Amino acid sequence: MLWFFVVRMAAPGSSSYSVQSCHRLLLVAFVALCSASSSSHGDRSPLSVVSRIAFGSCSNQSAPQPIWDAIVDFDPQVFVWLGDNIYGDNKRPFRVLGKERTIGPWKNVPRFFPSTEQEMRRRYQLAKSNPGYSKLRQTAQVIGTWDDHDYGLNDAGKEFSGKNTSQRLLLDFLDEADDSPRRQQAGVYTSYLYGPKGKQVKVILLDTRYHRDPLSSDGTILGDSQWEWLEKELNGPESEITIIASSIQVISNLSATTGPLFHTESWGRFPKERERLYKLIHDSKRSGIFFISGDVHFGEITRYDCGGQYPLYDITSSGLTQAIEKVVPPFFAFAVRAIAWLTPTTMRVSSVKCRYKSCTYAQSNFGTIQIDWDVVPQKIKVEVRGINGDPAIAVDILLSDLQPRNTNTLEGTWQHRRHCSLEIDLPWFWRHSFAFTFLALVSVLIIAFVLFAYTIVSVSKKFLRKFKID
């Protein structure tokens, strides 16, 4: 059943631009109009305005998933998968010694390895049959892209041999039509257009896996064909809002401030590629652009003021089941929040609406976008919500603030320069302050343990001497 006016933007060179496809589109629109009155979701017509969008990532199909109830209660018209829609690969336990060593200087096998096609299909079916998710599929259109674990292998890129099989399985999970251009192209990127003229929302889904070069290469993320397609998308007909969905974070570069202890995947690991993306957005002069992303197992909202002709936001929601605080004992949750607060960042948006001082949220979460088309100026509320649907991070964005402006005026305004310094450009000591703090804490714990052990041994010796004397 079609509830919305949706135009699908196919990849360049596909047959969807032919006259025959135009006739088909008209036929689909006619069928949608005829079926609108029988929609199970009230009076939403194919031309209805889209104002409520939810998104999420990192959902382990074998874990409890109570968060779907909160997503259904939010009542989104569209739900966007941002990757790790299932965990399709397998992992060996951490082992420094033994026959299979997965970490350390004597590592001899990779920790992660792919599943068979049959096992991947079984996991997708398990995810799809979840009662909460099934209920969402009845009330919202579900679209999405992938990340590494549903691509088939942790941190994998273009070298992964099973990517074509994984592409077919993902598109089956998303109920993609058999004749969809996504089934013919190299990669799962695509776009959607919602709503009538004057209130249109475009959603661009990127593929950050199929064409991605190795992490240490500073090569390409999207590949030539996807870059060509994206340029046409951004320079195409205007829409009031354009949401660019990336499975990995675009603006934040945590690896620059948590290394060498921890590393995350992000566009920041490919600085030339990210600069190309910013330049493309700038040159397109397209208004209303912001990013949504996943992958990192916590939520945050970041902002970059010097990447275009207006501030660029990235709303990160991760994960639906996989979250940092879920893998540590509850009494260590404060330590996770303290670490997040102490980690240097130049891009994270601070707000009085944040539940924690760090303005990160490391429990199960999903993202929401609410568009108020009727107020002046029009407003977008973006939030990261917890497992019960309560907002943990929230930012209000005026649509008028996402309009191309005079670059000189923009750079001369302090308000638009707060989030201009890249993490990699921070002073060396400050950039690595997290590592120094972490190592200092570990050193203190080791010293405390040694002193405690020394005290125990000393007291024991004195007790034994006294016992012998007596």
Give the location of each predicted region:
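Classical eukaryotic N-terminal signal peptides for Sec-dependent ER targeting/secretion
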Residues: M1-L27
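Metal-dependent phosphoester/phosphodiester hydrolase catalytic core
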Residues: C22-R24, F30-D470
